[in-house]
Design a protein with these regions (language model features):
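Class I S-adenosyl-L-methionine-dependent methyltransferase catalytic core
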Residues: 1-145
Length: 145
C-alpha cells in the first residue's frame, strides 16, 4: 500500500476485503487491512483524521459478485452505481477529516476520466499531479474548509 512502515501506528489502513493469493506472475499478494471497512460507511467519528488517502477502485469491468482477473484482485472493482458509490466515498472522507484536514485522492483513468470523478465531490481540488507510463494516474489534493 502507500505507507513505508506497516508497523507505524500513525497509519491506519482500511479496505473492504482481506485476502491472500498468488498473482498470475507467481507473486504472493496479500491484503491485510487494520480495519475492514467499506469506504462509503467508514466506522470513525466525525473530524477524526488530519490526513486521509482515498484510493478507490477504478475498474468497472466486474459484474460478478466475486472479483476475478489479476487487476481486479489487486485493485478491486467498482460495482453498481459507481457515481453514487464514489460520491458517498468522498462524503465519508470529508466527514472523518478534521477541519483544515488534507485529502489525497488517487485515480487512474483506465475507464473513467478524472474530470467525471471531480464532479462527484463538493470540494474543489487544490493541487494535482499526473504520473504513470501514460500519465493516466492522478494524485489530487483537497483541503477541508
Amino acid at each position: 500500500m502507500f505507507y513505508f512502515d506497516k508497523k507505524d501506528d500513525r497509519v491506519l489502513f482500511c479496505d473492504n476485503r482481506q485476502l491472500k493469493t498468488i498473482l498470475c506472475d507467481g507473486r504472493d499478494y496479500e491484503i491485510n487491512p487494520d480495519v475492514l471497512a467499506d469506504f462509503t460507511a467508514l466506522p470513525f467519528e466525525d473530524d477524526t483524521f488530519s490526513l486521509v488517502v482515498f484510493d478507490p477502485p477504478h475498474l468497472l469491468h466486474n459484474t460478478e459478485s466475486e472479483i476475478t482477473g489479476w487487476q481486479q484482485i489487486k485493485y478491486g472493482a467498482l460495482t453498481g452505481d459507481w457515481k453514487s458509490e464514489l460520491r458517498k466515498g468522498f462524503a465519508e472522507c470529508f466527514r472523518v477529516l478534521k477541519p483544515d484536514g488534507v485529502l489525497i485522492f488517487k485515480w487512474n483513468e483506465t475507464n473513467i476520466k478524472v474530470s467525471e470523478i471531480l464532479k462527484l465531490t463538493p470540494v474543489k481540488p487544490l493541487v494535482g499531479h499526473k504520473s504513470g507510463k501514460r500519465s493516466n494516474t492522478h494524485w489530487i489534493c483537497f483541503i477541508k474548509n
